[in-house]
């Protein structure tokens, strides 16, 4: 876990790798809960029997579920001290190059693209994150997340 002592410390790290998460196993139960939360019950996600004969040979996590893992995975990599709160401001360049089969393990690696001073003690950080599937040549998700830190 990398600790930035302040938003100035964070800004000084622009262009650097900030960390890599632990491996996380994707379970069918988590996929089903995500399907319930989003209303996306497509068979490739929630019907293991049908999915076994489908294009991936098993059920797969939703792309948006993989994206939704970013906060969980990024919180393992770094923290910023001296801030009152961190606000998810949005995303850039989100792609899902490869599926995430249920039962597989994923982890993320993040780099700090840049930090912009917005004034009044607020900075906006752009973090590039790649989520990889263990044993896969292609990443499951590549995204830039934008976080505002209020000091």
Curated annotation (Swiss-Prot):
Enzyme class: lyase
Stretches assigned to the MaoC-like domain: 11-131
Protein name per the record: 3-hydroxyacyl-thioester dehydratase Z
Lineage of the species this protein comes from: Bacteria, Bacillati, Actinomycetota, Actinomycetes, Mycobacteriales
Chain positions recorded as substrate binding sites: 60-63, 86-89, 97-99, 124, 148
Family membership noted in the UniProt record: Belongs to the enoyl-CoA hydratase/isomerase family.
Function: Shows trans-enoyl-CoA hydratase/3-hydroxyacyl-CoA dehydratase activity. In vitro, can hydrate (2E)-butenoyl-CoA, (2E)-hexenoyl-CoA and (2E)-decenoyl-CoA.
CDD domains according to UniProt: NodN (cd03450)
GO MF annotations, alphabetized: 3-hydroxyacyl-CoA dehydratase activity; enoyl-CoA hydratase activity
Domain of life the protein comes from: Bacteria
Species name: Mycobacterium tuberculosis (strain ATCC 25618 / H37Rv)
Pfam families: MaoC_dehydratas
Transmembrane residue ranges: none
